[in-house]
Amino acid sequence: RPFPLIRNKTLNIGALIAKKSNKKHAKELEFATVQVPSVLPRIVEIPSEKNGERTVILLEEIIERNIGKLFLSNDVVCAHPYRIMRNADLTIDEDEAEDLLVEIQKQLKKRQWGEVIRLEAEEKMDKRLLGILKEEFEIKDTDIYNIPGPLDLTMLMKVYGMEGFDEYKSPKYTPAPVPEFQNDKDIFQVIREGDVFLHHPYMSFDPVVDFVRQAAKDPGVLAIKQTLYRVSGHSPIIAALAQAAENGKQVSVLVELKARFDEENNIVWAKMLEKAGCHVIYGLVGLKTHSKITLVVRREETGIRRYVHLATGNYNDSTAKLYTDCGIFTCDERFGEDATAVFNMLSGYSEPKKWNRLIVAPIWMKTRFLQLIEREAEHAKQGKPAEITAKMNSLCDPAIIAALYYASSCGVQINLLVRGICCLRTGIPGISENIHVRSIVGEFLEH
């Protein structure tokens, strides 16, 4: 009997069973597996013997303790939960793909059955059962993670959602309104009066949604161009873009189909936007479009004016309440020219000869950062004030790290906020003693 196909990231109970027999000789063991149903709640509340106490049991424990009822003619020798993760990378030859959307849809179907790269097993799992799983999944010992507790802790979000524990939760944070956009002033007038900087989630994301909504309805708006990487489930941004197209605006939307684990959602949004009349593009071959930018072209009494929103965070009204990000509204013509150049480039037109304000990757962002670090090093050598403060998701580029080491050795004071991987070592005498690295772990995700 072939080994069953185990779906990616599903929780399963593996068991060794043997035919019931009165004979004393060694029984032949067989492997059996039961998938824990995802349609049932994983946390099951059971009656408590003590007043004021609430007792819960995990669904997999119930199955594990009663698994013998599924194999009545067998003895259950052991039963333990396990979970696998498969390689989720999509293998796409964009040069050969006639339709990127269709090709990604094909690859997504294969994702559930990719190569196994990780096995999570209960720490006390029977070694015979673990050996069978290791052999069948063709993994090494280093790919096996023995967990001293429940597997797949995403279920803790369900615990957080249980009623009756409000006193243990952090008070819900309410973002502050943005002063410039209060009093129901026309959003374009506010931006004309001066650039507006936003810091989410401390400041409300509402002006960003209102910007697209007003652009969709404003009779003076000729065109809206926007990049979308991740959006919320019932996105007001998507609805506004669709409405803009239906109102006769020229709407161009870059939907990044390769946004990791959001591919299926983005395919749905791309089809919906196309159906509404938007021009949907997927970006440059071989590159992922990670920038967040909106360009609104508006006809005014003084002529055509371009309004731009740039941000570090996604156009996602849900995560904007949980992720720390920055954004800016401007109608500075230099930013308008650069934003137009970005969309022309993403649409397949040539790269502009010069950029006014935007630093664009992979064209020259790394080069520019190296220049700025070198500038501070020169300032330090000349006895001038020299300091670098930078915030990033990760730091693992060898050239950037080497440049920071050099700047530190020259006397530059360097403060880094690194959310994730950091390959730079601090405190090395003569090399990195002037570098301080912090990773903030708080109520919000440092995005």
What residues fall within each predicted segment?
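N-terminal localization/anchoring segments of enzymes in phospholipid and broader phosphate metabolism
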Residues: 1-388, 397, 406-410, 420-446
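Cofactor-pocket helix-loop regions in the catalytic cores of large enzyme subunits
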Residues: 393
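Hydrophobic alpha/beta core scaffold segments
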Residues: 413-417
